[in-house]
């Protein structure tokens, strides 16, 4: 059953974290934040909603990098019950979709809880002060849409505005996805 994200809590301060990346290194938020803003997105490998946007996420991330915005992906699912989301499969998923951003493993699920993440994908767009300005979706595309010219680039446009003004758009469309798979 699909889950929607909650509305943006403008000004909420990003929580620090220290997580292992698929490159086997440990990173903190301070290591990875962007000069003009940061996107943190909770994703996984098995969810059809994530699979549908993975290539668009890779593209938008490359475009955001050009304007000083970094992207950080975090996988917080229970890998014991969802082995497709394992650390090794995270590496494979990243390669398959040509991710050029850090893909971090939240093994203890503390970061997902700290951020009140509810689904995959769940996007958090922060300004350069690491204050939340966007909690929306990647774009207006439907799950199987591949016609780029018909899609409104909501994440990109919001982060572009944030990079220029430190403020996110008032109107935001919630992301939809699979629920985070919590450990029991």
For each feature predicted by the language model, list its residue ranges.
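Core SAM-dependent methyltransferase catalytic element
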Residues: 182-184
């Amino acid at each position: 059953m699909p889950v929607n994200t909650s509305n943006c809590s403008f000004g909420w301060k990003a929580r620090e974290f220290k997580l292992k990346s698929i490159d086997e290194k440990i990173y903190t938020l301070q290591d990875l934040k962007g000069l003009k803003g940061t996107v943190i997105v909770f994703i996984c490998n098995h969810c059809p909603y994530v699979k549908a946007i993975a290539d668009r996420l890779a593209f938008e991330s490359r475009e955001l990098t050009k304007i000083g915005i970094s992207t950080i992906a975090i996988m917080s699912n229970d890998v014991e019950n969802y082995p497709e989301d394992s650390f090794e499969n995270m590496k494979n998923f990243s390669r398959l979709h040509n991710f050029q951003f850090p893909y971090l493993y939240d093994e203890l699920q503390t970061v997902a809880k700290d951020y009140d993440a509810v689904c995959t994908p769940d996007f958090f767009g922060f300004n350069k002060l690491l204050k939340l300005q966007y909690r929306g979706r990647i774009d207006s595309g439907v799950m199987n849409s591949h016609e780029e010219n018909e899609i409104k680039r909501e994440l990109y446009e919001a982060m572009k505005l944030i990079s220029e003004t430190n403020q996110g758009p008032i109107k935001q469309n919630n992301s939809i996805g699979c629920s985070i798979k919590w450990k029991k």
